[in-house]
Structures are given as structure tokens and as C-alpha cells.
């Protein structure tokens, strides 16, 4: 930062910087100092290689189901392991096969993305509710706090009873 301040103090204004540039050669601009620092500190080695998860590299249904995750592999036998049969199956047919709604919608979403080559295949994790979900959060937290207070109250009463039995408390 001191190097930056010294450059600002030396240059003063654009005219002064131009005069110095004519006399001494080019001056390092303030912008080049800022832009020379890297924007990201994470190394490239942490990024996953998604080139193998594209439409050109997936030729069987088992690989497709393993890449999209969410335990869709258990439905492999319904499609007889045939990717073409899966891609030609409609939502209504999947319903008659006995695939539950959330899994069926997930599979259809990935089928659309796969056919149109929109996104590399990967698992979309299911969201987890915190404190019973947004709608129930207040009641769940209130019950949790009430139970905690009740436990503390019972613990205090037990400690007082023990102290009274030992003769430490005289009432």
C-alpha cells in the first residue's frame, strides 16, 4: 500500500505524470498495479473435470444415472439398462412404472438437459430444512427453547434437593 501511496504522491496530477513520462520514460500507472494482482486465490486443481460428463461421453443408462445421482440407479431395471428407452419414455409412462414424483421430475429435468446438451451431468443435492422449514421455524425454535428451559429447571430442582438432603440448605 505504501508503494501505491508513493506513486500517487509523486504523480500529483495527470499533467505532472505526463511531464515525468517525457523526461524519464513511462511511469507505472496506478491501474496496472491494481490489475496485476490475481483476482482468485483458489488454485485450478480444485476444479472438477466436467469434460467426461457430456452427451458425447455417456453411452449407457447406468453411467447416466450414476452421474446424476440421487439414487436413480435403483430404477435401472425399469428401463432395461437402455438409454434410448429412457430418453423415449414420457412422464406418464414413468408414473405407470411406479417412479415417485420427486425422482421422476428430477430424471425428466436431467433428460431434457442431456438431450439439449445444456449442462454437464452432476448431482443436484436435495435441500435440507433448517428448524422445520421457513413456515415452521418460529414454533420449532420456541419448542426447542422451552425444552431447554424445562431441562435447566429440572436440573436446578434436583441439585437443590440433593443439597437439602446433604444438609447444606436449612429452611
UniProtKB/Swiss-Prot annotation:
InterPro entries to which the protein is assigned, alphabetical: Ribosomal_mS41 (IPR039603), SAM_Ribosomal_mS41 (IPR019083)
Top-rank lineage group of the source organism: Eukaryota
Subcellular location: Mitochondrion
GO terms for cellular component: mitochondrion; ribonucleoprotein complex; ribosome
Keywords carried by this UniProt record: Mitochondrion, Ribonucleoprotein, Ribosomal protein, Transit peptide
Renumbered residue ranges of the record's region Disordered: 122-141
Transit peptide: 1-23
Free-text function comment from the UniProt entry: Involved in telomere length regulation.
UniProt family annotation: Belongs to the mitochondrion-specific ribosomal protein mS41 family.
Protein name: Small ribosomal subunit protein mS41
Species lineage: Eukaryota, Fungi, Dikarya, Ascomycota, Saccharomycotina
Amino acid at each position: 500500500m505504501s508503494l501505491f501511496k508513493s506513486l500517487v504522491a509523486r504523480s500529483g496530477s495527470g499533467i505532472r505524470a505526463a511531464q515525468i513520462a517525457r523526461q524519464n520514460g513511462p511511469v507505472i500507472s496506478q491501474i496496472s498495479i491494481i490489475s496485476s494482482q490475481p483476482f482468485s486465490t483458489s488454485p485450478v486443481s480444485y476444479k472438477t473435470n466436467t469434460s467426461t460428463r457430456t452427451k458425447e461421453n455417456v453411452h449407457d443408462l447406468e453411467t447416466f444415472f450414476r452421474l446424476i445421482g440421487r439414487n436413480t440407479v435403483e430404477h435401472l431395471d425399469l428401463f432395461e439398462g437402455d438409454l434410448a428407452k429412457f430418453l423415449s419414455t414420457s412422464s406418464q409412462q414413468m408414473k405407470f412404472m411406479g417412479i415417485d414424483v420427486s425422482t421422476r421430475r428430477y430424471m425428466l429435468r436431467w433428460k431434457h438437459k442431456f438431450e439439449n446438451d445444456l449442462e454437464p451431468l452432476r448431482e443436484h443435492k436435495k435441500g435440507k430444512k433448517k428448524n422445520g422449514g421457513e413456515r415452521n421455524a418460529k414454533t420449532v425454535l420456541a419448542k426447542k427453547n422451552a425444552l431447554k428451559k424445562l431441562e435447566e429447571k429440572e436440573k436446578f430442582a434436583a441439585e437443590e434437593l440433593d443439597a437439602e438432603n446433604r444438609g447444606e440448605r436449612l429452611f
